Each structure stands twice: as C-alpha cells, then as structure tokens.
Regions:
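Radical SAM enzyme core and accessory elements
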Residues: 2-5, 12, 47, 62, ...
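Conserved beta-strand positions
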Residues: 5, 71, 218-220, 279, ...
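Phosphate/oxyanion-binding loops and surfaces in catalytic or ligand/nucleic-acid-binding neighborhoods
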Residues: 45, 91, 127-134, 151-154, ...
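Flexible glycine/acidic-rich beta-alpha junction loops that bind and position SAM and/or redox cofactors
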Residues: 10-17, 104-107, 220, 226-228, ...
Length: 494
C-alpha cells in the first residue's frame, strides 16, 4: 500500500512568519506533527511519503504514485486542502481526510472518499483494519478520548528538518478551563490527558539523535493543565536530560495566566529550557472576561502577571481579542496602553470569531447574529457575526490598535520594555550560527537603512550591544516585527 500524506499550504498569516523566515533561510515554522504521528500509526510494511506544501510543491505525479492520499487541515488551510481534494478527484486517487477542519465540518466534505475523524489513535486503526479487509467505511468517528500512552513517536524521517525553524512535540491534550469562544475543549475535552515522562523523553531523544539542536515547541493548548505532574515528574526529568546533553534545545509552549501564581513551576520551566510562553490574555476589560467565561484572568493585575513571568526568564507572547459584547469605544486605547505597558512584544490582536461547536457559536446562533463562516484567521479583519458596537466602529478601532502597536517606533520601544524586565535563565545562552549573523546583517539593511523608522531600530540595537546577552533576541524580535507589520498592512489595504 502506497500512502501519500499531504499537509496543505498555509496563507500569509500572523503565525506563518513567512517574511521573517526568509532572514534565516527557512521555509516554515513547524512541521506537520499530526501527519507525522499518523504515519507512525500506519502499518510498517506500507510505503509512506509526506509532502508539506508549506515547504514543497505538490506535483501530480506524487498524487498518481499513491493508492491513497491522506490530508489533514485546520480551518485556515481550507482553500488549499479543497484544491488538493479536487486534484485527487481529477486524477482518480482516493482521499482520506482527518483533523480539525473535517472533524468540525464533516457535512461539508461528504464528497471525500473517507473521513477519519476525531483523534487518530482511536479511529485510524479501525480504518486500516477495514481497508486491509477490503471493506473501508465512509466515516469513522468516536465519542471517546484517546489514551496518549498509546501515541507513537512521530516519523521524523519523512521530513527535511533543515527546512523548519523549530520542531514540535505534544505532551498533553485538553484544557481545564471553559472559555466560550474556544474550541479546544470541544475537540479534546476538559480532562488533561498526558503522555508518560518516558514518552516525552523518548521523543526528545529522537530529535536529538537526528541532529536537531534548536527550538522545540510543546504544542499543548495548556501546558500547565496538570501542574503537579509537571513539577514532580516531567520537568525534573527534562532538566536532567538537558543537563546530560549540554542543553541542546530551547523550549516554548502555551499556558494560562495562572502560571504567574506558581514560582516553583516557573523556576522549573526555565531550568528545563523554556524561554517563551504564549498566554491568552484576551482583554484588559473585566466585563468582557466575565462575558466569555475567562475566569482565570478575572480579578488580576494582568500587567503584573506578565512582568512576573518575564522576570522569571520567559518571554510572554499573548493573544488579545476585540469585539466582545461588553467592549466599549474605550477598549481600543485601553488595549494599546496595556500592550505597550506590559512589554508583550508578540501581541496577536484579533477580532472575536465564533468557531463551530463553541458555546459562543451556539449563543450567537440563538440570537440570530451569525453571518459568514469563520476563516480561521482572526487577524484578517473578518468576523463571522454581527458585533454589538457595530462592524464599522469595530474595524476602525481594530485598525487603530494594530497600526499603533506595530508601528516601528512603538514596536521597538515595546521590545526594550520587555528586555529591561527580562531575566534569561543561566542556561539560556544564544547560539550564534551563520544564519543568525546573516539575519542580523539583513536586518541592518531592511530596518536600519531602508526601514520606515531607522532611529528606533538603532536605539534598540545600540542598547543591546551594550548588553550582548540580549542582542540575539533583540534582532530576532525586530525581524518578527517586520513580518507583523507586513501582515496588518496587507490586510488593511485589502
């Protein structure tokens, strides 16, 4: 059996970093972890190939080679995956589809040969069994949740690692919280399901053995969902593993704001090699936090929480949302002030959207306020419902926020605000490779010579040269800022 696994292309988005990746000669940020795991579940005697369209062109002869084409997609990849499915139909190659898009919208993909929905550890073996018997069903679904103790190590040999900025692994699925706009719990539930410590170490070892010596992203939606297991087992084991191998990786992940409450956990994460964490802050407006059931953020000094995490040794990236029913016209200036004051450099500010299956979606449907389908990109100036403040006021205010915080002067000043408060871990020493030196020189040209606000760039660089431990990060963030500006400029012009 010949299986071709295809990861559809991703459009130019906030998290694609396409403009920034050119500075370090990379094609994509992350490899398709889901497909690499699916490949590991398939029978060993089957011949498998993987084409990641974010790094490699998909040719018709690749599709003709395969007996089956396995595709996955998030909502944001919908346009690309639809084109792949149509190409397969014309060529006559059967398609097996799974992943978040197809699990959320199976009724819109009845034309696909086989739908293997929910978590692959449960439904894929059933499809394989029936396929080997010659009687595969149209749809495979389940209401159960997978036991991650059975999840295999991804087949890294199917990709070329050098094309990616970082590798990724998964430790857990699920989130204990219940934000009404989030579909994570719809897909994975509230109970935190974890891999064993030995599994995580084995995955790290597999990357290490293949020569990877760079950043690794823990893709968990909330890495700190089970703090006790982290502090007692996983993090101490990673610390020992990293020390024995002279700290080959740095880590980043996603977590909730209550990380700031736990000094011990932050200390262990930094000792293990974590230097960055993404947190859903959403809004400084307490009424809006209550509206969306973001209970873990209510009643806090959110700026102080961010600065606590920064001082512990981790950069805080954060998501923010505009368009809540409780938002007033003052929210735009308040959000700008919050982002600048907190030193959240990578601030993903998006418009509220209601994904299918969420409590927000169901409420808006009841109120007859849904409009178009969500695009999966909440920074593209689209919104799939009628906002209470009016769409024109919301879009005008949104444009003001992103154009202000990503102007070169405000952005570079925010980098300085962060770096002045940041205390990197003692093992978090930047690695200067040829691509890093080349990226620095490119940044001088694009930002320091032909850039829109050269003075603020040079202010950042000269400050960092006096504090060389920050130079690598300062240059990296400056380059990322160029990407962020290009994203919002392209959307606003459109």
């Amino acid at each position: 059996m010949k299986i071709l696994l295809v990861n559809p292309d991703v459009p130019l988005t906030f998290w694609s970093f396409k403009k920034a990746l050119k500075f370090i000669s990379k094609k994509a940020v992350l490899p398709p972890l889901g497909l690499l795991t699916v490949a590991a579940i398939l029978p060993r005697e089957w011949e498998t190939k993987l084409i990641d369209m974010t790094t490699t062109k998909l040719r018709d002869r690749d599709l003709r080679w395969a007996d089956y084409v396995f595709v996955t997609a998030m909502v944001i990849q919908r346009k690309s995956v639809d084109q792949v499915i149509e190409r397969c139909r014309k060529i006559g190659t059967k398609v097996v589809a799974g992943g978040p898009l197809f699990t959320s919208l199976p009724e819109e993909y009845v034309h696909v040969d086989h739908l293997v929905l929910k978590e692959a550890e449960l439904t894929l073996p059933l499809f394989v069994r029936d396929l080997q018997k010659g009687c595969p069903r149209k749809v495979y679904n389940t209401h159960e949740k997978a036991d991650l103790h059975q999840t295999p190590i991804p087949l890294w040999n199917l990709i070329k690692m050098k094309k990616y900025a970082m590798m990724c692994i998964q430790y857990s699925r699920g989130c204990p919280f219940d934000c009404d706009f989030c579909d994570v719990t719809t897909l994975f539930g509230h109970r935190i399901r974890m891999k064993t410590t030995n599994q995580v170490l084995a995955e790290l070892e597999s990357l290490y053995a293949l020569g990877w010596r760079d950043e690794v992203f823990f893709v968990d939606d909330n890495f700190i969902g089970n703090k006790i297991h982290l502090k007692k087992e996983l993090l101490p084991a990673i610390i020992a593993w990293m020390k024995k191998r002279q700290y080959p990786f740095s880590f980043n992940t996603q977590a909730s704001i209550n990380l700031a409450d736990d000094d011990e956990l932050m200390k262990l994460m930094v000792q293990a090699g974590f230097d960055c964490v993404f947190i859903g802050i959403e809004t400084p407006n307490q009424e809006s936090l209550s509206e969306c059931n973001k209970l873990q953020n209510i009643g806090r000094d959110l700026v102080a929480c961010v600065k606590t995490i920064q001082r512990s040794g981790m950069q805080v990236q954060a998501g923010f949302i505009l368009g809540f029913d409780s938002d007033k016209s003052s929210i735009f200036d308040n959000l700008i002030h919050f982002i600048q004051q907190s030193g959240v450099v990578t601030a993903m500010v998006g418009l509220l959207n209601a994904p299918r299956g969420t409590k927000l979606y169901n409420r808006l449907m009841t109120e007859n306020r849904l409009s178009i389908a969500a695009t999966g990109d909440n920074t593209d100036f689209s919104i799939n419902f009628v906002p209470k403040m009016g769409i024109d006021n919301l879009l005008k205010g949104y444009h003001k926020v992103v154009s202000t915080i990503y102007s070169p002067r405000n952005y570079h000043e925010r980098v300085l605000t962060f770096l002045r408060n940041y205390r990197p871990g003692k093992n978090n020493k930047p690695r200067y490779r040829y691509c890093d030196i080349k990226a620095f020189l490119k940044s001088i040209w694009h930002l320091g010579i032909i850039g829109k606000d050269k003075l603020s760039y040079w202010k950042l660089i000269f400050w960092s040269l006096k504090r060389p431990q920050y130079l690598h990060l300062a240059v990296t963030l400056a380059i990322c800022g160029l990407h962020f500006r290009s994203i919002f400029e392209s959307y606003s012009h459109a």
